[in-house]
Amino acid sequence: FPDARERNLEIEYQRNMERYQFLKWGQQSLDNFRAVPPGRGIVHQVNLEWIASVAREENGMWMPDSLVGTDSHTTMINGLGVLGWGVGGIEAEAVMLGQPIYMLLPEVVGFELTGTLRPGVTATDMTLRIVEMLREHGVVSKFVEFHGSGLASLTLPDRATIANMAPEYGATCGFFPVDETTLEYMRLSGRDPEHVENVKRYLSAQGMFYTPDSETPEFTSNLSLDLGDVEPAMAGPKRPQDRVDLSAMKSHWHESLVAPIGHSGHGVDATQTGQQIEVVGSDGETYKLKHGDIVISAITSCTNTSNPSVMLGAGILARNAVQKGLKVAPWSKPSLAPGSRVVTEYYDAAGLTVFLNQLGFHNVGYGCTTCIGNSGPLEPEIEAAIDEGNLIVGSVISGNRNFEGRVHQKVKANYLASPPLVVAYAIAGTLDIDFEQDPIGTDSEGQPVMLGDIWPTDGEIREVMAEAITPEMFNERYSTVMSEPRWDSIPSEASDLYPWAPESTYVRLPSFFEGIQPEPDPISSIEGAHVLLNLGDSVTTDHISPAGAFPHS
């Protein structure tokens, strides 16, 4: 829907008003506490573009910036040279109240990057290769630090994409040191030039500013990757570390469909792989739905929407596709959910919004959507066809996780890909395609169109990026980020104590503290306790407590 963003924001306020009233009270009543209003972006991307200082001065003392957050992808900020990772809610609350974070000194794995990416290979492709390598190496509870001559070829958003996926490769964080690229991004995103210079002076004095001549630290173990070896790829169908070269996707899909149910198999009987169910869509169009058809195609998640190169690549590909007369497959549900309002600003400046809209990639809101299961419902006719034919249908998203059932309960094959590939697969409408051999569609003249005919060149992307993105754009958007009409109208008054509402079903006075004395009761023995869950490998909290919407039945 063209007005999806506004409609979704209205629904968000209706559903979460009690929470927002509580946060608004906190902003008015507590020192050093800010609440960014809803609809302004994903916290990790807003932090990257605006909040993080990299280093700061307090009471005459300079110190490095640092971060803990209650979402696992808090690690994204390590791309900016800010050490940060995800923690539990109680830990985060303790930090807010002035307590330290306690941790064991971690092992640090060195990851050397050399060379440069080949033309047509994206930051997403690189990140999926790094995820695969680090999962194989084993980095759980460890820090990863990136270094090497290859850093010079990576933009700050490229680094943020890699850092964002630290939970997927299993590390506590994936850290990039501060260098000239970091400072360039700080200037581009509208940070105060004097502050940027002070950051460099402070970190240089501390021996923490990275240059090509910096000595390689001593690590507990080491890996290396020549960026020139990275291939275009996707990851799936059920785990982010299961990378598949794009050139092998068609054969991979055929094997995955009939393989026994597991991390990469769907267990479809070989005699049923040709199953097709006729669907009459809500617009009256008739088509046949089959295994491998892509029913969700989403440019989503701060993992990639924070990176202008892949986002503009998707927009240019959309423009080229529309000019060829291509359309999104009628069974595919496209969506666009940027991580900040700056993305909309540079899409508009580049004249690409209209082409994304023509393909159905309307802006549905600034926040976590399809990657966390908030894709919204499929058309009832499509869901019915999936059930009738026991179809294994797919999604292609630019997110960071693809565990089975996370994106949508009806969608079993979920692949992570760059934003340009999301658009390409939405047009193709199926996983059963070899883009090197098979046309993506036919143009307005009935001639076959190959993906290479519409794929943007690196030069095109750089040219559009240079023209469309300016520091003024960041300054303008973030100058009003703390004000939103609905947020401003929420009734709330500052007070020393929160005025609990007895009728509230959402924000309630906890009963756990009733009867607590200054001296705690003696600790008693736990008897008769049993193991709640005993789980094998690759079982995640998504399997134990799934995200997303509750089914109607």
Predicted regions and their residues:
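Short loop/turn segments at secondary-structure transitions that flank enzyme active sites
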Residues: 117, 231-233, 252, 302, ...
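Short hydrophobic-aromatic micro-motifs
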Residues: 174, 532-535
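Long, structured ligand/cofactor-binding scaffold of large enzymes
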Residues: 1-113, 125-128, 232-235, 249, ...
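Short conserved micro-motifs at the rims of enzyme active sites and ligand-binding pockets
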Residues: 122-123, 234-238, 347, 406-409, ...
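Flexible inter-domain linker/hinge segments
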Residues: 2-61, 189-191, 197-284, 449-533, ...
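A short, polar/charged loop/turn motif at coil->beta-strand junctions and beta-hairpin connectors
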Residues: 105, 140, 219, 290-293, ...
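Conserved, well-structured core segments
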Residues: 297, 422-425, 531-533
